[in-house]
Each structure stands twice: as structure tokens, then as C-alpha cells.
């Protein structure tokens, strides 16, 4: 039996990311350091992941770079 994929919804803005997963939401600074920490926390779950975000005037670039660097799928 395969483990279901955890979908993580992310609303992107210039300063912050609004993250929603596991029936919780929180804000995360849209900066490399906080994003790297968040990616590590997600990977520690050791389950299939899929990040979902909407491109917003280029503000998603830090998120895309971090996800790619850590091997986390994003669409």
C-alpha cells in the first residue's frame, strides 16, 4: 500500500508565504533562510510531497529555488 501524497498549498506574496497543510496554516517569510528550514521540516516527514503555488509577479522565485534545491516537487 503506497503512502498518500501530502499536498502543501502556498499563497505567495512579496514579504510572506501563507502555507496550508495538515489542516493548519501559518505565515513564513519569503526569504532563503526560512524557506530552507521549512523544506528540511517537510523532508523530515519522509512522505511523498507536492507543493502547490500560483506564480505571483516573480515573488515565487525564492520558493521555486528552495524547492528545486531540496528536491521537493512544486507546481
Predicted segment positions?
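Phosphate- and other anionic-substrate recognition elements at nucleic-acid/protein interfaces
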Residues: 1-75
Amino acid at each position: 500500500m503506497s503512502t498518500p501524497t501530502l499536498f502543501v498549498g502556498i499563497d505567495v506574496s512579496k514579504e510572506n508565504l501563507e502555507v496550508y497543510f495538515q489542516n493548519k496554516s501559518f505565515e513564513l517569510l519569503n526569504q532563503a533562510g526560512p524557506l530552507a528550514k521549512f523544506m528540511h521540516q517537510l523532508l523530515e516527514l519522509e512522505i511523498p510531497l507536492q507543493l502547490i503555488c500560483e506564480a505571483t509577479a516573480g515573488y515565487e522565485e525564492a520558493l521555486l529555488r528552495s524547492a528545486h534545491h531540496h528536491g521537493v516537487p512544486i507546481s
